[in-house]
């Protein structure tokens, strides 16, 4: 009997790479009947890559609307689906997950972030209450998640916390897919640009990246959404090529122009043990990386010889790394080849999806 599955989210777009492209499509390709529910500016239903997608017309203008209006709409639609397994992706949906569990459904919580550590540096939460809010959020997350059928998360570090609460915790790392990156673009010795693709925020080190690219006099190709006027103004530097928010094909085109990819997140509780998907996308594209010198990242990057690690707060150090790879293109090419090999052999979604399918078949 084919199991009917409903994925739902309030915080992610309906075409989210992890949720739709990786998890939902992988499940559909393995015989599950998949429906994905999300909120957006327009209502539509379609079937894409064997996944039924339902976008609810619930524009999300602020967090309050997401927490209440969107959550209510998603829950109502999820009940209509009457699935065997429900799989949700946002902590504010934990109470809904437990309600579905009490209706006799199998329920999976997919924790994309280390929530309590993430809250501890959220700029929209006043500093004076961040610690108590983080403490309360951890207690609430623990209470609800421990009562569900399974927990999926993105890193071994987060798994350690959930292992204390639940016997069925699975790590599905957010690695890139070989199907999306079947081969690396041909390396051209005249690649003269570097790139950063992702959210453009201070905590992700974008200001230091902009300064370092200017100091090294190298063109920087950027794609992603910014969250402040200061960052928007800084994108007008002469050496910056800002592409805006782009589709997946454009991302790959940007990669093909560059000799290195930057992922220099600033130190933060939720960054130090993270596995940023852009790091693995650079690897998939055969790009050497310039990355933050966090212990786990440094260990992996040095083991596979796929790039350079820097202090992400030190503009001069980032600039020196950029110049080093720019002046040593053959070495950059070799590091990129090492990165691609590590991706194909170890760090790809096709390996991770096997754990996802095994979990589903066990429920």
Residue ranges of each PLM-predicted region?
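Membrane-proximal helix-turn-helix segments that form the acceptor-binding/catalytic region
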Residues: 25, 72-79, 99-102, 109, ...
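Acidic donor-binding loop of glycosyltransferase active sites
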Residues: 256-272, 287
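Conserved donor-binding/catalytic core segment of Leloir-type glycosyltransferases
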Residues: 5-6, 152, 187-214, 220-221
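Nucleotide-activated donor-binding/catalytic signature segment of Leloir-type glycosyltransferases, i.e.
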Residues: 221-224, 230-255
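Conserved acidic donor-binding segment of nucleotide-sugar-dependent glycosyltransferases
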Residues: 303-304, 308-315, 324-329
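A short, well-ordered alpha-helix in the C-terminal region of glycosyltransferases
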Residues: 317, 324, 331-346, 355-358
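N-terminal strand-loop element at the rim of the active site
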Residues: 7-21, 25-66, 76-77, 158-163, ...
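Donor nucleotide-sugar binding/catalytic pocket of nucleotide-sugar-dependent glycosyltransferases
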Residues: 52-54, 134-183
């Amino acid at each position: 009997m084919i199991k009917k599955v409903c994925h739902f989210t309030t915080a992610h777009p309906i075409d989210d790479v992890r949720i739709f492209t990786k998890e939902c499509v992988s499940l559909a390709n393995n015989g599950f009947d998949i429906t994905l529910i999300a909120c957006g500016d327009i209502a539509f239903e379609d079937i894409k890559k064997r996944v039924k997608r339902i976008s609810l017309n619930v524009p999300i203008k602020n967090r309050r609307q997401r927490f209440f209006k969107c959550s209510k709409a998603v829950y109502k639609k999820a009940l209509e689906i009457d699935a065997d397994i429900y799989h949700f992706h946002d902590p504010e949906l934990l109470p809904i997950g437990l309600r579905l569990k009490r209706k006799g459904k199998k329920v999976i919580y997919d924790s994309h972030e280390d929530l309590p550590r993430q809250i501890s540096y959220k700029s929209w939460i006043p500093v004076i209450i961040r610690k108590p809010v983080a403490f309360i959020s951890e207690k609430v997350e623990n209470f609800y998640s421990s009562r569900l059928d399974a927990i999926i998360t993105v890193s071994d570090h987060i798994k350690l916390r959930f292992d204390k609460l639940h016997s069925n915790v699975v790590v599905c790392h957010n690695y890139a897919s070989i199907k999306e990156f079947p081969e690396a673009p041909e390396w051209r010795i005249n690649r003269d640009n570097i790139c950063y693709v992702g959210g453009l925020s201070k905590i992700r080190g974008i200001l230091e990246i902009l300064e370092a690219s200017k100091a090294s006099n190298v063109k920087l190709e950027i794609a992603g959404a910014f969250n402040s006027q200061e960052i928007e103004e800084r994108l007008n530097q002469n050496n910056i090529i800002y592409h805006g928010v782009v589709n997946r094909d454009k991302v790959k085109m940007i990669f093909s122009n560059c000799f290195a990819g930057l992922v220099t997140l600033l130190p933060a509780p939720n960054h130090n043990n993270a596995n940023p998907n852009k790091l693995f996308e650079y690897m998939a594209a055969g790009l050497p990386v310039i990355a933050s010198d966090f212990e786990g990242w440094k260990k992996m990057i040095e083991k596979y010889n796929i790039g350079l690690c820097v202090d992400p707060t030190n503009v001069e150090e980032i600039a020196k790394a950029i110049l080093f790879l720019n002046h040593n293109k053959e070495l950059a090419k070799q590091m990129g080849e090492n990165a691609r090999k590590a991706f194909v052999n170890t760090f790809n979604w096709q390996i991770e999806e096997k754990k996802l399918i095994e979990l589903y078949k066990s429920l």
